[in-house]
Every structure is written in structure tokens, then in C-alpha cells.
Amino acid sequence: MGALRWLSIAATASTALALNPEGLISAPRRSEAIPNPSGDVAVFSQSQYSFKTHKTTSQWNVLDLKSGDIKLLTNDSDVSEIVWLGSDDSTVLYVNGTNADIPGGVELWVSDISDFANGYKAASLPASFSGFKVVTTDSGDVRYVAYAESWANGTAYNEELVAKPLSSARIYDSIYVRHWDYYLTTRFNAVFSGTLKKSEGKGKATYKADGDLKNLVSPVKNAESPYPPFGGASDYDLSPDGKWVAFKSKAHDIPRANYTTAYIFLVPHDGSKTAVPINGPDSPGTPEGVKGDAGSPVFSPDSKKIAYWQMADESYEADHRTLYVYTVGSEETIPSLAADWDRSLDSVKWADDDNLIIGVEDAGRSRLFSIPADAGDDYKPKNFTDGGVVSAYYQLPDSTYLVTSTAIWTSWNVYIASPEKGVIKTLATANKIDPELKGLGPEIVDEFYYEGNWTKIQAFVIYPENFDKSKSYPLLYYIHGGPQSSWLDSWSTRWNPKVFADQGYVVVAPNPTGSSGFGDALQDAIQNQWGGYPYEDLVKGWEYVNENFDFIDTDNGVAAGASYGGFMINWIQGSDLGRKFKALVSHDGTFVADAKVSTEELWFMQHEFNGTFWDNRENYRRWDPSAPERILKFSTPMLIIHSDLDYRLPVSEGLSLFNILQERGVPSRFLNFPDENHWVQNKENSLVWHQQVLGWLNKYSGVEESNEDAVSLDNTVIPVVDYNP
């Protein structure tokens, strides 16, 4: 067992309370902590769902950055966003999600945090805008950007003011037809700019809307920003001097369903000129051969430079993300930074005009690194955070950083760190605040490395409540999606390993071939190897666990996975490894090889299987879970979950698998949500999902009998449709 890196679990048993599905789903969910200009306090939002009232309540709080104390700012559920206004330590601009004058619109209000309820309305906006970024100019005026849906003519889309069409028909002459969970229309996301004029009056200055909003995206045909379904405020930035806006858009001049290519556009804040790409095919500074996705544009403090990341490959969504720094107005080739570093960045911010901070996935964590703005390609950035996954970071006046993160053991962790000293002080953490998470701590998690098919593979181990290594617990083998993704030391409300562990399992979550954060070689090796290298890594991982962990019962083990993990569960069902498990759970996995062409992002399958469906069909069929010889091996009880709004992997994939399992006489159940996509996010649906998944696993692993508090399939009140005689 020398490869296992024990934390404190070897010496002491955990005293954590069991985390159950209701507690997970109803525990408070908090946003990033956003500091004021002086770094004295920070604001953050909090929402909480109640299974008693079946409603969500929300509030905004103030965190004292010296004491860590938290106090309520407002529990007005209409307050959707708050940003600090200028250099004033107590004045904020907030978004009121309702509009007294325009149904479906929002309002901008200005208030002092010491007297929040007595603010005033500064602007009335004609649609549902969000993602506000603001700067105060030398004149004292406030310039801002935000986004909303847009009509082709550039006006903001307001759903409440649109007449319902007489026909529901949709007509398409190009792809996409649909994406993620929606059908494309002639509408698109767009970044708008606006100004609040400062007026000096009695007491404090006041602000009022000045002029109309400007659509900065619509003048570029086929451009869209933020880019759905996951784009947001990180897709654009406003220069500190208020003069420029940079935004990301997928390439507007090539088919978007076939390529990942994206450009960073630059446009005056007032929209006086049409946006132009700084890294497009005709841009003078575009690096040679760099044609892939791009994102996270951010201006330097002096507004003279833009940092962003970009991939080289135009068909590989998980290609290496390299950092670039563009000088505004320059026609020189845009230089890359630390391009030889075997890590791919997720986010970037400026520390000052000469240095940057980047967020990077690294060995199952997401850490912060510092890097000079003129670093060469051979530079190795320096890490200054440790475990967990960083979700946000803001520079404080003393050049330290206010960091918001999560971990497997906490949903919210706020601390101060610096490039020179590392983590300095923890201010607040959810497992000390929330009764639902009471007692959770880093001791519930370990990791180990083992020899995989061709290299060492990392795996997390998550222990159950009151773990005792002298006892034996069934294995729950956790397989992640992506496939170019990974299990991270992060909190999840959908696939939380601690919830599974506390039923009475030891969860083992490997990061096999294809996993991100362990170098490009491991990640890229999955291409055309979906059922090859990763499966072999998982087999070797199971063997390692079986041989080395006396407290893990592999005879009664179970396995579960989603998306690519769902594919792998389907593949395992027809493989020898499938006979090692008492039950399987497949969530939104591909099943029929020839159905892969029904997805929306065609570049994905074309990259993964080295070509198009018609030129390389054998590559698609090479790893086909529905191959006849594999179906004949199906025998392990299996729960299949697939929802109607999943357009990435259509619901027919799950139905096909369920049909075959039923006809083969394999114990099986199909769980469907007509209103969910690739994920299950509705709180009540999430509870049913957990009850069914955990109940299925508990039934066949024996946990249902050994743990009187374990979730049972009978916990679900939804009736089961069963027409068997």
C-alpha cells in the first residue's frame, strides 16, 4: 500500500455526520466573494432550497475580511447581481430583477451597504440583462457592459413583450439545428454597453442613465457573445479606462458546428466602430497555425494589453490552452507565454501591468499560478495555492488575493493567499457554517497512484461517515465524463462522492487516460481509444484496489458514470469487468455507435474518431457498446438515466439500451426527466435522481440491508410504470 498517500485518516476515524441527498440539495449555495476597493469587506450571494416549502430563498451577505464575520446585507430575492461602484468602499450598483415600467426588463439601483434598503433607481433596462462589469472614468461617470439576448436588428429581446407565433414550425438551412438543450432561433447573445452619468448634489454623488444601450456584437454578422450554453461574463471585458470592450465569439465566418475556432474581438465602448478580431485569419498579429477555441479576454490595468487563452487545433475542444498577450494597436505577432508548460489554463487576471495570475487544472485540483507578462515559452509558472478547486480570485490592495474555492469536503471556502506566501488565512468555510455539512473535512479524502495501461494513473478515495479501516465497505467505482475531463477535489451538487460514500461505500474515482490536468499526453491519448486505454486503466485500477485495500469489498462493488462515463459503463456491461460489479448506473451515455452523428457539436466526434462518419465509420464502430457480441454478455443489473432535453446525446441512446436489457432479461430500470438536459438540475428532480441511483446501487450491493439509514428505491414517491404480467 506504499502508493497510497494517507492524510490523517490512517490515524483517526472521521466523525463527520452523514451527508444525505436532502442535505446536499438543500444546503446553502454561495457565490464568489467580491471585495470592495479597500479590501475591508466582500459581498456574496446565497440561495437555499427548502423541501418543506418547495421554494428557494436568496440573500446577499457581507464578509468581513479581517474577522471572517458574516452579516446579512439583504434578503430581497429580486437582487440578482451586485458590483462595487468606483473607489467608494460602501457604494454598490445592483440589478433589480424586476422592472416597474417594462415587463421583462430589469433596473439598475445604487445603494450604500450601510443603508442598502434606501437606494435609488439609476436606470431602467428594456430586457433581462446580466453579467454586469463596470468602471468609473476620470470624469466620474460609470461605464458598463452586460449581456442579453438580441434580435438580428440589434435590439434586446424581451420574452414578455413578444407575441406568440401562430405556428410552431422551425426551418433550417444550416447546422446547428439544436445545441445542448435548445433549438437555435434567429436570436443570439450579445454584449451591450451603457453609461451612467454622475451628478453632484447634496451629499453623495448620484448616477442616472445617459443615452441608449449600444449592441456591440450585432454589427458583426453571425457573431455571438457570450457563447452558449456555458458562456458568461468571462467571455468579455471592459478596459479600466472605459474606452474599449473585448469579447469572445465563435468564428463568424466558418460553420460553427464543425469547428471550435473562436476570435477575440475589440470594439470601442461607445460602439462607434464595428468590432474587429485581434486573432482572426486576416488579423496581422495572429500566430501561425493557431486556429482553435479562445477565451477569457482581460485588459491590463493600464488598458494597453489584453491577455487571453487560445487553442491551436480547430476541431479539438480540449486542446492545450496557451496564454497570449496582445498589445492594443500592435500588428506584431501576438506572443505566447509558457507555451511549453504541460498544463492548460482555465482563467487569467492581471496582477499589475507586468504580471498575471492564472487558474490552472493540475493533478486533480485547480490552482493559482503567477507568471510575468513577458515570460518565454519555456517559463514554468509558480503555484501559490494548494488543494481544492479555485472558482474566483480578486486582488486586494496589499497585492494578496481573496480566493473562493470548493473541495470534496466543503461547498464554499474563502481564504487569502499571495504568490510570495501561499495561503495566508482562511476566512470562512461552509463545513463550519452549515449544519448540513457539519463535521466534513479534508480527512475524508485520500488519493493514490497506480500503474495503468501505459503510465501512472491517479485516483481519489472518499471515505464514508465514521470510517473504520478495520471494517469492509463495498466499492463504488466512479467514472467521469468528458472524456477530456477529470475528477477534481471539488464540490458537486450532481455527482457528489461524499453523498455516495455516506451510504456505506468507499468511493474510488480514477482519472484514467483522457483525463485533464495531468499533462497533454495522458489527455490526448484517448483519441480513437474510447474503449481501449481508459478501459484498461480502469481494469488495472480495480485490480489494484482488490489487491491492496482490505477495507474495500470488491465482491459487492458497484459502478456508475455519466456522459463519457455513461458510455464506459455501457462498455463495461459487455466486458469482463462488468461481471465484477453487482450493479451499474449509466447516465446519458452513448450506446449505438452509428448514432453518434446525431450529436450537435460535430467537431467533437470527428476529432475523437479521426474523421467523418462516412470516411471513417469503422473508427466509430470500433468501440460500439451495442455490438452483438457485447450484448450477449449483458447480465449485470443496470439503471439507465436519460432525459428528453439532452441534445448532446439524445434520449434514444438510453431507450435503445433499456430496450435491449429488457429483451435480454437483465434486471433494469429507465429513469427519464422530460424537462432536464445532460444534467439534472431541478431540485425536486435531483432528489428523485439521487433516490433512484443510490437506491439501485444499495439494493444490489447489500448496503440496503447493512445500513438502516440507506436510501431505498421505495423512497421515491413517483409511481413506477410496469406492464409486466
Swiss-Prot record:
SUPFAM superfamilies cross-referenced by the UniProt entry: alpha/beta-Hydrolases, DPP6 N-terminal domain-like
Principal location listed in the UniProt entry: secreted
E.C. code: 3.4.14.-
Family that this chain belongs to: Belongs to the peptidase S9C family.
Keyword Cell cycle listed: no
Protein name: Dipeptidyl-peptidase 5
Subcellular location: Secreted
One record GO biological process: proteolysis
Signal peptide from the UniProt entry: 1-18
Enzyme class: hydrolase
Record-annotated active site: 563, 646, 678
Record's keyword terms, sorted: Glycoprotein, Hydrolase, Protease, Secreted, Serine protease, Signal
GO cellular component, one term: extracellular region
GO molecular function, one term: serine-type endopeptidase activity
Glycosylation site positions: 75, 96, 153, 258, 383, 453, 610
